[in-house]
Structure formats: structure tokens, C-alpha cells
Amino acid sequence: MPRLPDSGRGGDKTVPPTDVTSDSQTVAERFRAAWTGPADKSTAIPELLPVRLARACVQVLPVSGAGLSLLDHDFRVPVGSSDDMATHAERLQFTQGEGPCLDAAREHQVIVAAADEIERRWPAFGAEFLKHTPYRGVVSLPVRLSGNTVGALDLFLENEQDLGRLSIADGITVTQQITDALAVAHAITKSATAWSDEPEPLWLQSSSARNRTNVWVAMGMLMTRMDVPAADALSVLRAYSYGHDAVLDDVADELVKGTLDVAEVQR
């Protein structure tokens, strides 16, 4: 079975998501058993299907954390993570506007990086990521549906040497299993809805996804106040977050709640 090379410190590999072998069938079975097994009450509702899928990644693969982000009308939305630390890692990527998840989705490639490469390739994100999380390696895989990239799966490792233990085939097989699970769940939702309606995927109603929508609301507030386009409003939010050592999602939440004044952010 092909495996990700042991990158060591400073190693980075970009791999086309096509290397799948028959040996991965066992991984597929284990993954299905992990996410379809008895869920704890906190993740039993349909909205938290991506959380169950992310936790199953950690059970089946030699990784420390996992996070799943999907695209919604050109916006990247976090829909599920294995734990709070994996959630924070995704939020750091979004705050800095760079990182492996973004590159995997943009380049339609599997991204593999150890600590030194994380710092080199994404300096702003890398500095915060290595400072505020225990992770020292990351593998990001594009999530594809009907030939289109619809998001990315981040796999985080506390020991960068474990990058050499993670099979490309296993990672891609798990990603395909995630895509299938989400597609089936959404099809079931659609079948229960009037034919003229296009229901929103239930996982976009999760708390992590709803929290991200506050960023778009905050952007709208800045666009109106400053008379700037959306990209500039997002840049202002990122600059304020960086200058105050804060996560962009938290800054947006404070703006929407009114505990932070727009004038303070635009200075």
C-alpha cells in the first residue's frame, strides 16, 4: 500500500487524490462501523453528522484530531471536528486567510506538511498554529462530490513522525466515505421536502456553521459603515483579529452582539 513519505521537519508533499488501493476496503469498513455505531447523546442529532464523521477519523486513522469544512456559496464553513482543539485549528486558518485546508480545496490536491513546512508555507497561520495547538503535522484532503471539490478534511498530528504512518489510500478512502455519508443524508432530507424546495443541508445548522455566519454579518456591517467591498471588509476583520491576538470568529461575534464597536475595528 502506498504511504505518505516520512516528511521529517521541513518536508511537504502535494499529492493528487487518486492513489487508492484495494487494501483500503478494510479501512472503509472500520470507518463505517465507527461513525454508524452508537453515538453519544451529544452527537446523535442529524445536524452533528459531520462531528461523528470527524471523530471516526481519529478512531480509524493514526491522527490526533480531524476537522471537516465545506463550501457554501463560495464561503468555507466548518461543519464538524473531533474536538475543541481541532475546531480551534480550523478557526486559526480562517483568521489568517491561509493554511492547508484552503490550499487542498483550492488546488484540488492532498497537502502534507510537518512543522517546519507549516511555518514556511503559511507563515502567519503557522506561527499561531504551532503556538496555540499541540499539533506538529497536518494532512489536508479535498472533499469531492460529482467531480467537484466541495470542501476539505484536515487531519492533525501531534507527532510529525506519524506523517509517515498515514496511508494516502486510507485518507482518501475515508474522505470518500465522508462524501458518501453526507450525500446520502442530504438526499434523505430532500426526499422529505416538497419537490419545489431545495432544503439546506442539516449540518449547516450546527453551532459551528451558524457561528461562522456571524462573520458574514460582521462583514456586512463594515461594508455599510466603510463603503468597501466584501473582500476589504474581511481584510479589516483579519487585521483587527491579528493585532489583538484574537480569532476572527470571536471578533465577529462581538460585533454582532454589540459588545465591540464597528468604529474600534475600522481604526
Language-model features and meaning:
Residues 136-144:
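A short, aliphatic-rich beta-strand micro-motif
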Residues 67-71, 77-79, 86-123, 127-136:
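Regulatory sensory and allosteric helical modules in signal-transduction proteins
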Residues 1-95, 236, 253-267:
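Intrinsically disordered, low-complexity terminal regulatory regions
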Residues 187-267:
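Signal-transducing coiled-coil/dimerization helices and immediately adjacent hinge/linker segments
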